[in-house]
């Protein structure tokens, strides 16, 4: 039995929508080529100026991780959402958070 994993490398910038479109396209390509595990890089959804980071941060229920869970479920893959800047509700602190999704789209683990 073989198991194919894919590590996606991409250059992200300050345009979150463009970054998410690129990530989705590459995830779909990896899955179409047989990958059952796909890993995205650190800060794949946004990379910009430090002063703009608070506005780019998301909660675990935000746009980026909702999309990643949906893709994992749709493509029936394990998906490691490299990391995003997480803004924990009720806290001023931000975290560099990675989330692993299972083939059912549910979060299996998170590292903050």
Regions found by a protein language model. Name each.
Residues 1-6:
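Extreme N-terminal starter segment of soluble prokaryotic enzymes
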Residues 9-14:
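Short polar catalytic/cofactor-binding loops
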Residues 16, 25-104, 108-112:
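Cys-nucleophile CN-hydrolase/nitrilase-fold catalytic domain and related Cys-dependent amidase chemistry
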Residues 19:
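Substrate/cofactor-recognition hotspot
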Residues 22:
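PLP-dependent aminotransferase-class I/II
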């Amino acid at each position: 039995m073989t198991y194919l994993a894919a590590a996606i490398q991409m250059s992200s910038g300050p345009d979150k929508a463009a970054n998410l479109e690129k990530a989705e396209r590459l995830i779909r390509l990896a899955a179409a080529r047989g990958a059952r595990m796909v890993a995205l890089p650190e800060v794949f959804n946004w990379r910009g100026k430090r002063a703009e980071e608070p506005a780019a941060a998301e909660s675990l229920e935000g746009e980026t991780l909702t999309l990643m869970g949906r893709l994992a479920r749709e493509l029936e893959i394990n998906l490691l959402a490299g990391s995003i800047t997480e803004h924990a509700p009720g806290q001023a602190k931000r975290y560099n958070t990675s989330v692993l999704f299972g083939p059912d789209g549910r979060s299996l683990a998170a590292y903050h």
